[in-house]
Amino acid sequence: MVKFDRICMALVCMVCSLNVSADDLKLWYSRPATVWTEALPLGNSRLGVMVYGGAGSEELQLNEETVWGGGPHRNDNPKALAALPQIRQLVFEGRYREAQEMVAQNFETPRNGMPYQTIGSLMLDFPGHEKATDYYRDLDIERAIATTRYKVGEVTYNREVFTSFVDNVIIVRLTANKQGTLSFTASYKSPLQHEVRKSGKRLVLIGKGTEHEGVPGAIRVETQTEVKNEGGHVVVTGENIQVNGADAVTLYISAATNFVNYKDVSGDAHRKSKAYLDIACKKKYEQAREEHIAYYQNQFNRVKLDLGTSEEAKRETHLRVKHFNEGKDVSLATLMFQYGRYLLISSSQPGGQPANLQGIWNDKLLAPWDGKYTVNINLEMNYWPAEVTNLSETHLPLMQMLKELSETGRETARTMYGCDGWVLHHNTDIWRCTGLVDKAFWGMWPNGGAWLCQHLWQHYLFTGNKAFLKEAYPIMKGASDFFLHFLVEHPKYGWMVTCPSNSPEHGPEGDEKKNAPSTVAGCTMDNQIVFDLFSNTLRACKILAEDAAYAEHLQKMIDRLPPMQIGRYNQLQEWLEDVDDPTSEHRHVSHLFGLYPGNQISPYTDPLLFQAAKNSLIYRGDQATGWSIGWKINLWARLLDGNRAFKIINNMLVLVEPANPSGRTYPNLFDAHPPFQIDGNFGYTAGVAEMLLQSHDNAIHLLPALPDAWRKGRIEGLVARGGFVTDMEWDGAQLSKVIIHARLGGNLRLRSYVPLKGKGLREAVGENKNPFFQVERIKEPLISKKICPQYPLLYRVYEYDVMTEPGKSYCFERI
């Protein structure tokens, strides 16, 4: 035992000293960006900047999280309520196209959400630098700093840019190795209606958000830039800032709007922008830089991943992507994993807005899909990595948004459906619209709020924060209240179902390309989401000792929901009827919600459903849009197939270039739908974590889906439900050592493909008594009489229990 304790102590020291080379966590290039998807993103959640790194002309494209078109508005259609009974009748009669036409006439409105918008850019023009040599630029995601370096003649010029988490401004540091050689002009360009003026030592841009779909532009934004020069002289005019003959220069850039909250735009953009800059300019550059790095690394350094490295890792980043499928650059998977964490830290901090389809980076007035919050998969995917990759605080902006949506969605539920509670359809914006967005084919899906409530419950399972659960419970209850009133008895089956609704962006006859209707009743995803919502609300009700009668009502409704069904192709049915097309490779795999991110399909308790879900995913194919690939990585991880998950990773890491515009990763590692959507980056990061650690199915499963390509490696800092922080080491594609750090204590149940030994370990027996680990009690699936059910082939697992105490660590190793 003494010897084993020494081994554990050595392992603790080994894990604590784990340090991936800084070069492995940099994106670097030997030429400036020429297009936006080559520029490098920096952000502090509120401010975003894309750094092009030009020598003769540098562009710093600017965003502020509250610069949106339009203003406070609603998009409820009061005609919906009267039309609802007839729409339901048409659906139940199988007249889906007629039902969808009625939805279009009575649910749609001219307002489909407002667009996220750019401020514009700050341009830095350097005369005579056009023919620079020895060029280099990078983004160091261990420090959240972008660097540009080059030579003009014998002079070496260097720029550092970061978006300070502490001072809430963008800071640019320019130096040269020869005194008096820094000369440039700074000016703004913007597609907004704007004006530029001088204000003391500052150059100020005042802009206005645009009108959109009849909603006047309510946002006013002010950007201020000030130069601190060392040597030389500075002239500020009404158009630009001119710097001549300086030794070094620091630029401070602030931006702020009049946005207060979704219903209040009475703020003072000038006062806020000025205040940020007043404070920031008092600090020396070195202090500001040090404080920024410390804040960022407090979050980023919690997780370290080492999958090995190779000579290929020395290539420029876009070339690494281009050659990834040759199979030699294993550490690119590490960089991409940590890049997702970097982007989440940079786009979602407490007190701010949630990351939208663009994160916070957008160079347009009309971004793809308006850069809004699409909630039939995309917004949820943005936050899949938050808890498991040890970034729980990045989840909080989404929680605040949910609180606000529960307020606006209450009016939508009453006006459009005559229901209690609150509802959200498939899209929203900064103004928290909750009515139907876009056409009926996409928009007739009232489950957005229900799905998002899963994030409230998962945050509780990972953190054990009962005070948070008490605040979240009214939101969950409100969403449940809506469905308790909205569900209707199916006249044929007797189940309680959603109607009207759809399986996102897909119908039994195809998608929008086939002009097919999507409006149906009780599709599988809806049933799974409502089951998830009711079950989690019921648990929260019991934990908080709330209304027992309400809990009983929830349970009765759970019992009346449809079961999952296995169809004639041995697939998990997408709809109530067995009408799935096995040749469809549609991007949405909505009926697999119960597999991931839900936990309703377990290989150990529901093997037939598990195999049916696998068959459905096989039918959908391995190619997809970027975000869909991100989802499929997670799904194959849940299916315990690491090699198939890695194959999907290979499909994502394909470079978008002129010769291959259908690639899935841009040169700056942004995910490509195409075009850019940030959810694919977050889906990838969550998927890698899911391959290495799972905790949804009654135990912590160690290395559940490790691919052969990652035969040796180490991970530190992943978090399991119940607050168990997990460090692992493996070789030969098998777990060798693990340390568990217990934040909350309680029973720790481990699941492993190899037998383990360690102090306090005992063979697991019976149900896991830790309340943060749950097993869903689902109905027995209905199975088509046309098939012989298939059972999955599963690896043998070993399960152990050990009782833990808060704040203590526990070491185990392979026998």
Cite the ranges covered by each PLM segment.
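Bacterial N-terminal signal peptides that target proteins for export
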Residues: M1-M9
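Well-ordered alpha-helical segments within folded domains of soluble proteins
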Residues: I377-E387, P446-W457, M525-S535, S590-N599, ...
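Acidic/histidine-rich catalytic neighborhood
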Residues: G478, F482-A540
